[in-house]
Amino acid sequence: MQLTHDIQPEKIEKDRLYLDMGLSDEEFQRIKQILGRHPNFTETGIFSVMWSEHCSYKTSKPLLKKFPTDGPHVLQGPGEGAGVIDIGDEQAVVFKIESHNHPSAVEPYQGAATGVGGIIRDVFSMGARPIASLNSLRFGPLTNNRTKYLFSEVVAGIAGYGNCVGVPTVGGEVQFDESYEDNPLVNAMCVGLINHKDVQKGIAAGIGNTILYAGPPTGRDGIHGATFASDDLAEDSNKDRPAVQVGDPFMEKLLIEACLEVIQSDALVGIQDMGAAGLTSSASEMASKAGTGLEMNLDLVPQREQGMTAYEMMLSESQERMLLCVQAGREQEIIDIFEKYGLKSVPVGKVIEEKVFRIKHLDEVVADIPVDSLADDAPVYNMPSKEAAYYRAFQQMDIATPAIEDYANTLKQLLQQPTIANKEWVYDQYDSMVQTNTVVTPGSDAAVVRIKGTEKALAMTTDCNSRYIYLDPETGGKIAVAEAARNIVCSGAKPLGLTDGLNFGNPTNPEIFWQMEKSVEGMSAACDALHTPVISGNVSLYNQSKGKSIYPTPIVGMVGLHESTQHITPSYFQEKEDVIYCIGEAKAEFGGSELQHLYSGKYEGKAPHIDLDVEAERQEKLLSAIKEGIISSAHDISEGGLAIALAESLFNGQGLGAEINVVGDATVELFSESQSRFLVSVNKKHANAFESHFPEAAKLGKVTDQGQLTISISDKTIIHERVEELENLWKGAIPCLLKSKA
């Protein structure tokens, strides 16, 4: 396809060139009606990216409306670069999650790196200083050589960008499953801190005000990146490498500092990152939100390559670029700030009263489009939904409790499953301590970052067990939100809100859309029950390859507030003689569990049941006990069940052990993944106070200084292992798999 506006408009329709841009026949006819004429090549390209799923949410928008987005502390919900929640003292936390799945499948290093860069820009475009990054990653089995390559390069890309840009990577999650073999998921989250008075919006307001371009020149990288992200991943995906952007973290570091200084000037009206769809999306969205129009001259846009067409400049996704609206006559004030940081900024257009998006190039109008048709008036589709064929069969299955002969060996095998195994190989590559505010580093239930100059801190996590959501999307959606909140509470913080990263297959498949629909309903119910509004998010669809879809993976990024750093609670056992309790009861629930997969190689049956009222009550009571100072450690019981939680609580290098005695069926008690459960340790002087909070909690045993994990069932020892040996297996699993030959 020629990347030029020289192609005659009639030829675009005759040869159906718009199909290659991602537009349907019906959508092209709608564009003709909007314009009252044939669109030219540049206009067709502009519509194609703005009407892509990635930019318009045209199939997911009806579902997103189901999320609760309001709350007493929400200052900015969905609709801007990131959401904003009040944390008191005229301060707020800003956060969002974003996906970079397709680019990471094609060019994993740059795909992951630019995913980090893009989400950081979303946060500082709101006026916030980025203080932490997290990620949520999915790959195929680590026995596959291509998976090893993708895994290694994605982690290297996240580390390469994050470490250089000066924002600590403090947490995240990594899971492995066959459904992600050809379609990895790379979701990046950023958290920022802001004063209320500094909150910005991406608007182009004030007739006659100037549109300013800031950052490096525009090149040909990333053209049609938004469209690429809105289609199935092709088998010959190497041809899509030009759609992957190239990032420069050192440029971004300068851009952060320059923009945060610019934001202090009252000459600034609005600011937005040039993300997906580049100049096209930032300019048209800023005008649409302000109810204005915008005129831009592409001859003024800095260009990295010679002979770039209007089409290429408008659709380029070159990185580290920002678009600003500045008061007319005060442009030089802003230009001078950027120059101080060695960055170029130039006027490229102005705000106009007529609500059109008018683009000029080489003394010719190359696009003249009603601005709202690109944003709020983009098409929205109510997709057909059909219950997945497998779901009813799974619901009717009676999953037997696996018969275990050797409990110690089963524990060892589970500790070496890649999804459970230690992720030190990953997070050791990340700089988690830059900015010197990280209190709880990667590897705990939630990361914790202190707020300088205050007693407060922020807890943050990313969570999603996609196997549960595959088995039962509605129940799995509830569990995803509940587990994220559970992890925040275990750290001693109160959950504030969440950002959602909805990763699904092709929404034109009614069964996939049903997965989306039910997942959102489940998540929404949990958000209501746990008082955690959705303040931002991202949708990534068409995550399938060779006709095979990923498991539905709606990732939850959640942030919580510590009113005092004294309430920060570790996930590891602390001292010998501390009493160990389990809050919540285990049931024979093995559908989607790690034990089920270990013994059968499958995930099938019912997902674990969750009662949201019980979940909310237990979280509230545990948080109250933590604030009273009676909890020594708290750990969420999740993948692998109680046995894994016990082992993980000992893996802190202090030489501690535990003596545990449980009553009931050993397999159920140790390996069930029943929900709403916590493993806590309590100093024995606080045991009575704890039991008054949780009279139903099971007293399991005590912490020892013997370096042994001893588990008995009705006083009969079934596991007696050195903690050091268990920890070595847990830590060595992923490095061992990466070194092995497939």
Curated annotation (Swiss-Prot):
Where is this protein chiefly located?
Answer: cytoplasm
Annotated GO biological processes are: 'de novo' IMP biosynthetic process
Which residues does the record give as substrate binding sites?
A: S99, H100, N101, H102, R121, Q245, E317, S318, Q319, S540
Supply the EC number(s): 6.3.5.3
Give yes or no: UniProt keyword Nucleotide-binding: yes
- The superkingdom of the source organism is Bacteria
Active site at: H54, H100
Location comes to:
Cytoplasm
Per UniProt, ATP binds at Y57, K96, D500, G537
Signal sequence extent: none
* Annotated residues for binding of Mg(2+) 2: D122, D273
Query: Which keywords describe this protein according to UniProt?
Result: ATP-binding, Cytoplasm, Ligase, Magnesium, Metal-binding, Nucleotide-binding, Purine biosynthesis
Cellular component terms per the entry's GO annotation: cytoplasm
Q: Which InterPro entries match?
A: PRibForGlyAmidine_synth_PurL (IPR010074), PurL_linker (IPR041609), PurM-like_C_dom (IPR010918), PurM-like_C_sf (IPR036676), PurM-like_N (IPR016188), PurM-like_N_sf (IPR036921)
Q: Name one Pfam family in it.
A: AIRS_C
Question: What GO molecular function annotation could you give as one example from this UniProt entry?
Answer: magnesium ion binding
This enzyme catalyses: N(2)-formyl-N(1)-(5-phospho-beta-D-ribosyl)glycinamide + L-glutamine + ATP + H2O = 2-formamido-N(1)-(5-O-phospho-beta-D-ribosyl)acetamidine + L-glutamate + ADP + phosphate + H(+)
HAMAP family (alphabetical): PurL_2 (MF_00420)
Its biological purpose is as follows:
Part of the phosphoribosylformylglycinamidine synthase complex involved in the purines biosynthetic pathway. Catalyzes the ATP-dependent conversion of formylglycinamide ribonucleotide (FGAR) and glutamine to yield formylglycinamidine ribonucleotide (FGAM) and glutamate. The FGAM synthase complex is composed of three subunits. PurQ produces an ammonia molecule by converting glutamine to glutamate. PurL transfers the ammonia molecule to FGAR to form FGAM in an ATP-dependent manner.
* Family from the record: Belongs to the FGAMS family.
NCBIfam families given for it?
Answer: FGAM_synth_II (TIGR01736), PRK01213.1 (NF002290)
Q: What is this protein called?
A: Phosphoribosylformylglycinamidine synthase subunit PurL
**Which species is this UniProt entry from?**
Oceanobacillus iheyensis (strain DSM 14371 / CIP 107618 / JCM 11309 / KCTC 3954 / HTE831)
Q: What is the lineage of its organism?
A: Bacteria, Bacillati, Bacillota, Bacilli, Bacillales
